[in-house]
């Protein structure tokens, strides 16, 4: 099951040339670009690990792609995404985010149903990868 988080998630994986174009677009808008990674693909896992130091003042797309490739080298089976942050007053939020690497195999999720008080039923989504393996060895 292909994880669909962020922009371009329904499209085929981006090439490095396409990633450079997206980085250039983000930088042309004045956004800071950062690299994040995780091995926990849960949809509510909004806090991925920041790769290295924030790249707030980096204006060279090839330097950012270098950081992406270093993250790929050390996390070959993890999810890696680029996040563009708009620091403009009144916005101060992520303006774009997209996955630039994913594991070769994405096992997907299962739905757990729990009966609660009365006739209430609660549903929880769990990742097969997280359920099977500890953090750091999920893929």
Swiss-Prot record:
Pfam family name, one: RuBisCO_small
Locations listed in the record: Plastid, Chloroplast
Top-level taxonomy: Eukaryota, Sar, Stramenopiles, Ochrophyta, Olisthodiscophyceae
GO biological process, one term: reductive pentose-phosphate cycle
UniProt xrefs under PANTHER family: RIBULOSE BISPHOSPHATE CARBOXYLASE SMALL CHAIN 1, CHLOROPLASTIC, RIBULOSE BISPHOSPHATE CARBOXYLASE SMALL SUBUNIT
Primary location: plastid
UniProt miscellaneous comment: In this alga, in contrast to plants, the small subunit is encoded in the chloroplast. The basic functional RuBisCO is composed of a large chain homodimer in a 'head-to-tail' conformation. In form I RuBisCO this homodimer is arranged in a barrel-like tetramer with the small subunits forming a tetrameric 'cap' on each end of the 'barrel'.
GO molecular function: ribulose-bisphosphate carboxylase activity
Keywords: Calvin cycle, Carbon dioxide fixation, Chloroplast, Photorespiration, Photosynthesis, Plastid
Protein's UniProt keywords contain Plastid: yes
Purpose: RuBisCO catalyzes two reactions: the carboxylation of D-ribulose 1,5-bisphosphate, the primary event in carbon dioxide fixation, as well as the oxidative fragmentation of the pentose substrate in the photorespiration process. Both reactions occur simultaneously and in competition at the same active site. Although the small subunit is not catalytic it is essential for maximal activity.
GN (gene name): rbcS
Protein name, UniProt field: Ribulose bisphosphate carboxylase small subunit
